[in-house]
């Protein structure tokens, strides 16, 4: 049962809801019937609350979406506020919804495709790793032909990688055209996620952060400001894709959403939660994918389909 709903700022949705003693008791009985049920009271009640939320929150979620005309864009985070067997429990939830944004022009973006040049060392390393026997058995002409073949393969790979980078950048350019306020906590969370991704990239490539800054000619403060701007730009692009999908009629049908949800992929949609939110995640992913294709010119206008 909904007790309160409001927004700390546009798009930052907070609510408090309750469940009665009967609902809690039914969930407790379900948990206790399982062989690995928690023995301690706190653990038992916590598991029962989680079961109740996952089983009953979906209807309340749909009610919120319809009554308050919000478009959630993140999974809700739950917080248990109070619980006892005599009264049930009281819990809070927070999620982010599409804030009041406007998108300007979202076609006509231009981004050069710039493959990284190939060094001779790269060719030699590739031959040593994958063509060693072939290279040792070849004569001079064969060795030269092998190097040309490997160079062509590496170049084709780098061209494909460069095209992928250019497509991503085209989509990120959309972020520059999306205007309006963003929830501060959503921006902050996106920045920290971008920072984690950057740190993992440095580690994977064996690059020292100080060396990285030296090559870029930036101070720590300048880099952080740049990374923050990049994170917000990507967030605006991510939200802007939903606006483009709506404007161009690219939303998937219910049947398409159901078909995609039936073959759930955690890498694409994250962990399953509850039915209404899971459908929302799949629907928005499909819409964003189509909007991305539309922006880079690979998806037809809705009127042409």
Model-derived features: positions:
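FKBP-type peptidyl-prolyl cis-trans isomerases
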Residues: 1-305
């Amino acid at each position: 049962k909904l007790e309160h709903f409001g927004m700390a700022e546009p798009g930052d949705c907070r609510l408090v809801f309750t469940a009665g003693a009967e609902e809690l008791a039914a969930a407790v009985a379900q948990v206790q019937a399982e062989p690995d049920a928690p023995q301690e009271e706190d653990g038992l009640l916590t598991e029962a609350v989680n079961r109740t939320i996952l089983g009953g929150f979906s209807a309340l979620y749909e009610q919120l979406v319809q009554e308050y005309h919000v478009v959630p864009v993140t999974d809700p985070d739950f917080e248990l506020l109070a619980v006892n067997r005599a009264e049930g429990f009281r819990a809070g939830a927070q999620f982010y919804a599409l804030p009041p944004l406007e998108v300007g022009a979202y076609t006509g973006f231009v981004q050069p495709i710039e493959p990284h040049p190939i060094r001779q060392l790269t060719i030699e390393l590739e031959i040593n790793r994958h063509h060693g026997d072939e290279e040792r058995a070849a004569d001079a002409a064969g060795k030269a032909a092998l190097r040309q073949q490997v160079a062509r393969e590496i170049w084709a790979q780098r061209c494909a990688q460069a095209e992928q980078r250019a497509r991503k950048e085209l989509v990120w350019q959309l972020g520059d055209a999306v205007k309006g306020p963003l929830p501060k906590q959503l921006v902050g969370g996106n920045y920290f996620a971008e920072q984690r991704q950057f740190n993992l990239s440095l580690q994977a490539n064996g690059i020292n952060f100080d060396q990285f800054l030296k090559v870029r000619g930036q101070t720590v403060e300048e880099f952080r400001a740049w990374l923050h701007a990049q994170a917000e730009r990507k967030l605006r692009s991510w939200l802007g894709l939903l606006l483009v999908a709506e404007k161009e009629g690219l939303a998937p049908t219910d049947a398409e959403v159901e078909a995609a949800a039936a073959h759930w992929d955690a890498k694409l949609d994250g962990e399953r939660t509850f039915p209404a939110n899971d459908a929302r995640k799949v629907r928005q992913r499909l819409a964003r994918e189509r909007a991305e294709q539309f922006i880079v010119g690979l998806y037809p206008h809705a009127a042409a389909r």
